Each structure stands twice: as C-alpha cells, then as structure tokens.
C-alpha cells in the first residue's frame, strides 16, 4: 500500500470516528434557550423557527440553528473545544432586566451578569459565566439577543406568547439576520 492510499484511509477513519456534533462544525451558532410550555419562555423557539424558514441553504452551511431547550444550552456550550469551528455564538433567550415586556436588548460579552451560584443543576445553572468562559478561552464572539418577558408560567404549562413578546419575535429575527449577514 502506497503512502497516498494510507493517508486516504486514515482520513476516512478520522471522519468515521469524529464525534463532534454538526453544530460545532459551523462558523456561527444561533443558540435558542427556552421552553414553549412556559409562555414567554418559548420566545427563542419561535425566533429559531422563523430563522430556519428565512435562511438560505447556503447560509445554513455555515450557520447552526440550535434549539437547546431550557436545560441543554450548558451541555451544548461545554462541548466546545479547540477543534470546534464556531467563531460566533448568538444566544436567543428571554431576560429579566426590568425593561418593558417585549423590549429587545442586545447583551455583549462584557455586559453578561456574573451571578454567584452554589447549587449546580441544568435548570438553575447560570449561562452567563459559561458563555464568558467559552468566549475568552476559544476566542469566540458572543452576543445575547434578549427579550424582556412579560409572563413565564413555570411550573404551570401555558403554551403561547404574551402579545408584547410575540411582537418582538420579528424584531429579534431582523436583528439576528443583520448580524448574520453583516447588513
């Protein structure tokens, strides 16, 4: 077997055993955090669904749309390492910054809160410190497109967004598209 054939076989073996999730093989990740079962907490899911309809197939080759739900964003972020292709993460979530319900706030990495926590589980784990760590350790640009929630029904199930937050979905999509397309 010549050297060219050996190299080709090794390359195929590497691909077979590459366990990197597909969303970490793209330059940009739009990470939706939320749960449609809890009223306005489902904001990000609606944003991701609209982006999925609007983005072209060519754009989707470099942009990963990840609906991580309420508990999985931390797991998604902890999989990032030096082999990840991700250069930018746009997190979409509801926020509580004391602004008007439905108002959109863009939060840069340096503005992320730094909460102290003692208990560690996937529902109470603050995302901001992990976002900051990933951004700094792997030189990834991070932004949060946050929408001030009006009503989060948890633990009660309520499917549907408040009127204010529903109106904010299109605005968030426009902001994200400008960020993705460089408009």
From Swiss-Prot:
Q: Name one GO molecular function term.
A: enzyme activator activity
* Signal peptide (from-to): none
Q: Which InterPro entries match?
A: Pept_A31_F420-red_hyd_d, Pept_HybD-like_dom_sf, Peptidase_A31
What are the UniProt keywords, alphabetically? Answer: Aspartyl protease, Hydrolase, Protease
CDD domains, from UniProt?
H2MP_F420-Reduc
Q: Give a yes or no for keyword Hydrolase in this entry.
A: yes
- Transmembrane region(s): none
Q: Which SUPFAM superfamilies match?
A: HybD-like
Question: Has keyword Protease?
Answer: yes
Q: What Gene3D superfamilies has UniProt attached to this entry?
A: HybD-like
A GO biological process held by the record: protein modification process
Can you list the disulfide-bonded cysteine pairs?
Answer: none
Q: Which PANTHER family match?
A: HYDROGENASE 1 MATURATION PROTEASE, HYDROGENASE 2 MATURATION PROTEASE
Tell me the protein family, please: Belongs to the peptidase A31 family.
In Swiss-Prot or TrEMBL terms, this protein is called Coenzyme F420 hydrogenase subunit delta
Q: What is the organism of origin for this protein?
A: Methanocaldococcus jannaschii (strain ATCC 43067 / DSM 2661 / JAL-1 / JCM 10045 / NBRC 100440)
């Amino acid at each position: 077997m010549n050297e060219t054939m050996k190299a080709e076989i090794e390359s195929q073996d590497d691909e077979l055993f590459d366990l990197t999730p597909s969303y970490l093989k793209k330059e940009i990740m739009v990470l939706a955090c939320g749960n449609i079962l809890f009223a306005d907490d489902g904001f990000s899911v609606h944003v991701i669904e609209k982006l999925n309809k609007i983005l072209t197939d060519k754009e989707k080759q470099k942009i990963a749309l990840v609906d991580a739900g309420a508990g999985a964003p931390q797991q998604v972020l902890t999989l990032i390492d030096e082999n990840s292709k991700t250069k930018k993460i746009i997190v979409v979530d509801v926020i509580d910054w004391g602004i008007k319900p439905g108002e959109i706030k863009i939060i840069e990495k340096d503005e992320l809160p730094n909460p102290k926590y003692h208990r560690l589980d996937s529902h109470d784990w603050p995302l901001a410190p992990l976002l900051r760590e990933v951004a700094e350790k792997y030189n990834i640009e991070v932004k949060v497109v946050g929408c001030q929630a009006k009503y989060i029904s948890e633990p009660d199930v309520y499917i549907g967004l408040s009127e204010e937050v529903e109106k904010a979905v299109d605005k968030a999509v426009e902001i994200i598209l400008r960020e993705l397309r460089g408009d």
